[in-house]
Swiss-Prot record:
Function according to Swiss-Prot or TrEMBL: Gustducin-coupled receptor implicated in the perception of bitter compounds in the oral cavity and the gastrointestinal tract. Signals through PLCB2 and the calcium-regulated cation channel TRPM5. In airway epithelial cells, binding of denatonium increases the intracellular calcium ion concentration and stimulates ciliary beat frequency.
Name by which UniProt lists this protein: Taste receptor type 2 member 4
Molecular function per GO: bitter taste receptor activity; G protein-coupled receptor activity
Membrane-topology annotation of the record: Multi-pass membrane protein
Spans within the Extracellular topological domain: 1-9, 68-81, 153-172, 252-262
InterPro entries found in the cross-reference section: TAS2R (IPR007960), TAS2R4 (IPR030055)
Native source species: Gorilla gorilla gorilla (Western lowland gorilla)
Length: 299
């Protein structure tokens, strides 16, 4: 029964990854066409373009790895497995940093705080987006290299199982995993929660202001607040279980877990990227309009 449940989880994971690949290809193509036509691109669309490419490569790599694992007639190469893991870690970290930057941009641009730091960020963040994207790629590369370095020095063993159920030890330390992932993920989590909290606080202040002035609640600023807040909150709902599931999958004792636990981790780890990509499309006016045209849902 558990084997059937795990097999169903693998099938669902593959389907979700196909959906994610299509969604991120759509995001990338739409923003690329806009960039080519107008010879300019907004800061948020530049981040979405980078995010779409990164997630497309990451989900494609996951599918290649899954197909290789299922269909290969040879024993699984330890070095090829390590290559898949390292590439996935780099792309995953980059995509999470891009989402974090997107949330920061929404928070800074939409909130109406008059603090000098916010006013400075409002003026200066957009021109710095390309350099920030590059900086986050370098941070992701650094954390991946840190993982490699620590894994070589760590004494903790890990079991890797081949297709013929032969197990052997490789030096893949739990310490290296925890340090490299926590360094990146904890900071991302703090920034995203802070951005969402500031946006909610700004929305509450805006509502109170509208109540005092006896004006209508729903206006362009309110719509921007609510749209960005929904995207951030849904992102956190998807991101928290995803982070836990991904961390568990990388741990040495994951191979010895029961099929039920593996199935749950697989579903949570797979649901985040496609789910968040769909949310981006339905909350982004241009992407939503283009998607409706493609699906023939014109009003």
């Amino acid at each position: 029964m558990l084997r059937l449940f795990y097999f169903s989880a693998v099938i669902a994971s593959v389907i979700l990854n196909f959906v994610g690949i299509i969604m991120n290809l759509f995001i990338t193509v739409v923003n690329c066409k806009t960039w080519v036509k107008s010879h300019r691109i907004s800061s948020s669309d530049r981040i979405l373009f980078s995010l779409g490419i990164t997630r497309f490569l990451m989900l494609g790599l996951f599918l290649v790895n899954t197909i290789y694992f299922v269909s290969s007639n040879m024993e699984r190469s330890v070095y090829l497995s390590a290559f898949f893991v390292l590439c996935f870690m780099f792309l995953d970290s980059s995509s999470l940093w891009f989402v974090t930057l997107l949330n920061i941009l929404y928070c800074v641009k939409i909130t109406n705080f008059q603090h000098s730091v916010f006013l400075l960020l409002k003026r200066s963040i957009s021109p710095k987006i390309p350099r920030l994207l590059l900086a986050f790629v370098l941070i992701s590369a650094f954390t991946t290299c840190l993982y490699i370095t620590l894994s070589q020095a760590s004494p903790f063993p890990e079991l890797v199982t081949t297709r013929n159920n032969t197990s052997f030890n490789i030096s893949e330390g739990i310490l290296s995993l925890v340090v490299s992932l926590v360094l990146s993920s904890s900071l991302q989590f703090i920034i995203n929660v802070t951005s969402a909290s500031l946006l909610i606080h700004s929305l509450r202040r805006h509502i109170q202001k509208m109540q005092k002035n006896a004006t209508g609640f729903w206006n362009p600023q309110m719509e921007a607040h609510v749209g960005a807040m929904k995207l951030m909150v849904y992102f956190l709902i998807l991101y928290i279980p995803y982070s836990v599931a991904t961390l568990v999958q990388y741990l040495p004792f994951y191979a010895g877990m029961d099929m039920g636990t593996k199935s749950i981790c697989l579903i949570f780890a797979t649901l985040y990227s496609p789910g968040h990509s769909v949310l981006i499309i339905i909350t982004h006016p241009k992407l939503k309009t283009t998607a409706k045209k493609i699906l023939c849902f014109k009003k």
